[in-house]
Amino acid sequence: MKLLYTVISLIFLFTYPAWAQQHEIFNQRIRTLQVVGGTNWLSLPVSSLGGEPIHIDFDDMTHDYHRYSYKIEHCDANWNVSSSLFESDYMRGFNGNQIIEDVKQSINTNHPYTHYHLAIPNADCQLTMSGNYRLTVYDDNAENEEEGKMFTACWMITEPQPLVKLKIEATSTTDIDIQKDHQQLKMELDHSQLRITHPNQLNIVVLQNGRWDNAVINPKPDYLSAGKMNWQHVRALIFDAGNEYRKFEFLDTDHPTMGIDAIDWDGSDYQVKVMTDSPRPNYVYDEAAKGSFYIRNSDNVENNNTCEYAQIHFTLKAPKLPGDVYLNADWTYGRFLPEYRMEYDEMTKTYHARLFMKQGYYSYQYLMKMEDGSIRLLPSEGNFYQTQNKYNVLVYYRAQSDRTDRLVGYGELK
């Protein structure tokens, strides 16, 4: 028992440089990339071996057909490619030369585009190992592989049956304050089915609302017993409660819908103004989707290739802040890029951003990036213990005979 305690304690002394399950777009022709496990667009892109497929959807902003091929790579818990594996270790079928064949051109849209859809598994490839996966899409008509690299998409696959039991609880009675600005996670992990003999065999990731910028990696448990770990008063598992995500729904080009102030046509584009976001001194319950988005229009028929693209204008009323203000959501892919950064107007005391987006439902929040790279909540957005945050826990395991990490446990608390 003493040896087990020592080994497991050492696990939580390790740190990792770049935890990131983040999609990345390399070519500006690609828009509205979405990765969904089954039909659950409100959660992380997670499925199980033999379970529902992973769906990958995106638009190419031309009406030209492009021969897009894809390559799938297995990654370890730290999202590094599992270089010790052969492709046959984690998949059956073909990899690297298969073409995305589900293609539809847009119909009667101001901006023509072509929609592509891919489901994994499919007739050409089936995954056989749990863990992290990264798919890269290439344009086969490009002169070279680097020029043809269009985007990467990431998802997670769990074991068919969980190899660990996970209990998660969130409380507003924290070790920092009581029913004020924070939420604290309490967890219990039963790993009695696993044989743990080395500190690198187990990795645990805790996410708030699917965000990787404030992910907690390998929090040290404060209680250990035979086959179990408990986190009851762990400072690393205390999160800022924040506030509910904001949201809008752009469904029609003729009249405003939820959260839309005005829609204008300037001769080339629809200009859609989202209602100005004002400071929120009090908590108001709102069942927003924690950064998720769903593509549809008022007709709700063939949404993928009938929805319009428009210029969406965001306005945030707030004093000038010491850091850069960014829009943040699943549809920004967790990235703090120039296109998501808001500009400040000294005359109106407001922040502004304009993005080219497709019709649909969108939820979002504002975050502030400081000069040192740290990410903070905006003071004007409020910080309330009642906020309905979502927490995800990923448990990775590498047996002594394994050459990479498997995803043996997954939990979600809403």
What are these language model-derived features?
Residues 197-283:
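Long, internal scaffold/assembly segments composed of regular secondary structure
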Residues 1-22:
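Bacterial Sec-dependent N-terminal signal peptides
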Residues 272-321, 405-414:
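Basic K/R-rich, polyanion-interacting modules in nucleoproteins and related proteins
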Residues 26-76, 177-191, 299-314:
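Contiguous beta-strand segments within globular domains
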Residues 110-140:
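Ligand-binding face of N-terminal immunoglobulin V-set domains in extracellular IgSF glycoproteins
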Residues 77-79, 125-126, 139-150, 211-212, ...:
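Short acidic/polar inter-strand loop motif in beta-rich domains
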Residues 91-116, 212-224, 311-359, 371-401:
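Aromatic-rich carbohydrate-binding modules that target alpha-glucans
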Residues 157-180, 385-408:
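Low-complexity, Pro/Ser/Thr- and charge-rich linker/hinge segments at domain boundaries
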